[in-house]
């Protein structure tokens, strides 16, 4: 089973980017969307949990796209974290409404192994479904980084994994 999944991924990676749009009806389990709720006062959790995965994805021939709110990624941090500087792309200063649409378009292309974005609000069911479909079409991973709100408005976040991001400055 591992061999067939690997062969399937290799065939998809060699297909032109436009090819993925024609396969949208095909069931593909290689895509993943995950919301990561983090506390800004605990930076090591993100680095311990997320960096090994990003380092592994950095070995693929595809890019890593970072959709950051306002800050630019530090070149020094990218290199010291063991991420391939030549495969990391960043788009900053997107409004939240454009961030989700940009993430969907990027995931769908198949050009990125992972797309990471920061959002202040939870995804709607429709947004989550659109992101999952795009990730499956492009065989990509998408991570939505969301900071924990004040204690009075935590809601369902209490049972979630809280991961901080100190990845940009």
Swiss-Prot record:
Single Gene Ontology BP annotation: DNA repair
One Pfam family linked to the record: SulA
Swiss-Prot/TrEMBL site (Essential for degradation by Lon protease) positions: 169
Stored InterPro entries: Cell_div_suppressor_SulA (IPR004596), P-loop_NTPase (IPR027417), SulA_CellDiv_inhibitor (IPR050356), SulA_enterobact (IPR047696)
Region (FtsZ binding): 106-112
Keyword terms: Cell cycle, Cell division, DNA damage, Septation, SOS response
Domain of life: Bacteria
Annotated region (Lon protease binding), positions in chain: 162-169
Region (Disordered): 1-26
Function: Component of the SOS system and an inhibitor of cell division. Accumulation of SulA causes rapid cessation of cell division and the appearance of long, non-septate filaments. In the presence of GTP, binds a polymerization-competent form of FtsZ in a 1:1 ratio, thus inhibiting FtsZ polymerization and therefore preventing it from participating in the assembly of the Z ring. This mechanism prevents the premature segregation of damaged DNA to daughter cells during cell division.
Family of this protein: Belongs to the SulA family.
Complex formation: Interacts with FtsZ.
Protein name stated in the entry: Cell division inhibitor SulA
Species lineage: Bacteria, Pseudomonadati, Pseudomonadota, Gammaproteobacteria, Enterobacterales
């Amino acid at each position: 089973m591992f061999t067939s999944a690997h062969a399937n991924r290799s065939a998809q990676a060699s297909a032109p980017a436009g090819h993925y749009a024609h396969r949208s009806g095909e069931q593909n389990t290689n895509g993943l969307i995950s919301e990561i709720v983090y506390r800004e006062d605990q930076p090591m959790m993100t680095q311990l949990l997320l960096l090994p995965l990003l380092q592994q994805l950095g070995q693929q021939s595809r890019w890593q796209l970072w959709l950051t709110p306002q800050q630019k990624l530090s070149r020094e941090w990218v290199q010291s974290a063991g991420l391939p500087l030549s495969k990391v792309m960043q788009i900053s200063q997107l409004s939240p409404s454009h961030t989700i649409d940009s993430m969907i378009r990027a995931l769908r292309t198949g050009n990125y192994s992972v797309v990471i974005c920061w959002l202040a609000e939870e995804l709607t069911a429709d947004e989550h479904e659109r992101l999952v479909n795009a990730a499956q079409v492009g065989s990509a991973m998408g991570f939505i980084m969301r900071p924990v709100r004040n204690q009075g408005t935590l809601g369902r976040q209490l049972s979630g994994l809280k991961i901080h991001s100190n990845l940009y400055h």
